[in-house]
Regions:
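C-terminal ends and interior cores of transmembrane alpha-helices
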Residues: 88-119, 333-345
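Central cavity-lining transmembrane alpha-helices of secondary-active solute carriers
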Residues: 53-72, 303-315
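Extracytoplasmic
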Residues: 10-41, 141-145, 262-270
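Glycine-rich segments within core transmembrane alpha-helices of 12-TM secondary carriers
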Residues: 157-185, 382-395
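Intracellular juxtamembrane helix-capping segments at the cytosolic ends
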Residues: 139-153, 359-375
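Primarily marks hydrophobic transmembrane alpha-helices of the MFS/SLC 12-helix fold
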Residues: 83, 126, 328-329
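C-terminal membrane-cytosol helix-exit motif in multi-pass small-molecule transporters
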Residues: 176, 180-189, 203-229, 425-430
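Extracytoplasmic gate region of multi-pass secondary transporters
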Residues: 29-33, 181, 239-303
Length: 446
């Protein structure tokens, strides 16, 4: 029995570790916005906020374009080979990050004029890398989400496994901001960062992912044939005919939009406040110094946000008697109240606490969306991940609004709107209307 449990645990650990990498690199991508606004976009004029949020836009564009391929590849070649392809895209994306720095340093005169803005050519290479990284993250999650949800690990239920994996993912997102400020940009004040500092860290990360890929190739990851159509099998129904799934895609679109808007743009709001003479302090300290390293107040905000997600997911992983619908309703109501108070008081520390309440939204929405889909699950996962494109849309909308209004403060109302849509899904949209919603024998609602 112990041997069988150990065999069962192996694939779970491998996929959880890769999910950690996905979370870590997703946040590294987003946290580069603040420093690269200084290093790349000093001459971008009044469009700085719009241009810098394109980093998140191109990352999540990868989800919209490439997620459906993940579901098809799972049906065609299985979970493991699709996962290996995602790691290949990840290596390519990290290589492009390195190339963007090298190109800018080597060819400083290669500048693109867009209206009154002047943007280094290397910045567009970085955006290409962001797209490839988003593609890698999308394909990885298309594999990991349905696999972990359906994988039978003794003593656990689906939403628990999802929350455990998401908690480890959140640990990666929590430590990433300090990786950006201390290891990539050397702990310098944000006004002093240089493009050349990107080269070595991203090259090291690429080598690390290569090693992870080679290790995964040698690991045994059993296929879960009951979660995907057999090769050549035609599915009788359109995946969009499942109402609770379709509305789940809409809900995840708004959820990821809210999550990424906070995680990526809260540091930009902090920089704006500092420039207006309203610099934030952490227990009375304007700068977080360890020796000569400046950890940065903006990085602390992001760390509290992503750390709150990790803590919330760890707590939720023990709640095996509370249904996903009740969990989602409760945390969404709390998130709406918190954001309303934060916007009214212009308090970024309260916005950073939103991560705790958003922590279980992903796993609850996914679990409710794929309930009873059976052989449609793999295809559903690919379509579901298209909804993550919300992470591209809402941060950019927020950046445009900040440029138009001259402040980030009231742009957080966008996040409150997103939370209201999620609340609708929790209360109404996630309910399976009748037995025709399920391709097989109807299961009790969760």
């Amino acid at each position: 029995m112990e041997t069988r449990s150990a065999d069962k645990l192996g694939p779970f650990v491998v996929l959880t570790f890769i999910y950690f990498i996905v979370g870590f690199l997703t946040t590294v991508n987003g946290q580069c916005q603040g420093p690269l606004k200084v290093a790349f976009l000093a001459d971008a004029g009044a469009l700085k906020n719009t241009f810098v949020t394109l980093i998140s836009f191109f990352f999540f564009l990868g989800y919209l374009i490439c997620s459906p391929f993940g579901g098809r590849w799972i049906n065609r070649v299985g979970y493991k080979r699709t996962l290996l392809r995602s790691l290949g895209f990840m290596i390519a994306g990290l290589a492009m990050f390195w190339a963007s720095s090298w190109f800018t340093v080597t060819f400083p005169a290669a500048v693109v004029g867009i209206g009154a803005a002047h943007v280094p050519g290397g910045y567009f290479i970085f955006l290409t890398g962001s797209f490839l990284m988003g593609t890698a993250a999308a394909l990885s999650q298309v594999v990991i989400n349905p696999y972990i949800s359906a994988y039978e690990l003794p003593g656990t239920q689906s939403v628990q496994r999802m929350n455990i994996v998401c908690a480890i993912n959140s640990f990666g997102t929590m430590i990433a901001p300090f990786f950006v400020t201390t290891l990539i940009f050397g702990g310098r004040a944000i006004e002093e960062v240089e493009v050349r500092q990107l080269m070595a860290p991203f090259l090291i990360l690429a080598v690390f992912v290569v090693i992870t890929t080679l290790t995964t190739m040698r690991m045994y990851i059993p296929d879960l044939s009951n979660t995907r159509a057999a090769e050549g099998e035609r599915l009788e129904r359109s995946i969009w005919s499942f109402r609770h799934f379709t509305l789940g895609v809409v809900a995840i679109f708004f959820y990821v939009g809210a999550e990424v808007a906070v995680g990526s743009n809260i540091n930009l709001h902090a920089l704006e406040m500092g420039g207006n003479g309203e610099a934030l302090s952490f227990f009375g300290r304007k700068r977080l110094m360890i020796g000569e390293l400046d950890l940065g107040i903006p990085a602390m905000l992001a760390t509290i946000y992503w750390g709150g997600m990790m803590v919330g997911r760890m707590i939720s992983s023990t709640m095996n008697r509370i249904s996903p619908r009740i969990q989602l309703t409760t945390v969404t109501l709390a998130a709406i109240v918190l954001m309303a108070v934060a916007v009214g008081s212009n308090n970024l520390w309260l916005i950073a606490l939103l991560g705790f309440f958003q922590s279980v939204m992903w796993s609850c929405i996914f679990t409710l969306s794929v309930q009873g889909l059976e052989k449609y699950t793999a295809k559903a996962s690919g379509i579901f991940m298209m909804g993550v494109f919300g992470g591209a849309v809402f941060p950019v909308l927020q950046g445009i609004a900040a440029d138009l209004f001259g402040t980030w403060r009231w742009t957080w109302l966008i996040v409150i709107f997103c939370e209201l849509v999620i609340l609708f899904y929790a209360l109404i949209g996630s309910r399976v209307r009748n037995s025709k919603e399920s391709p097989g024998k109807r299961r009790p609602e969760i």
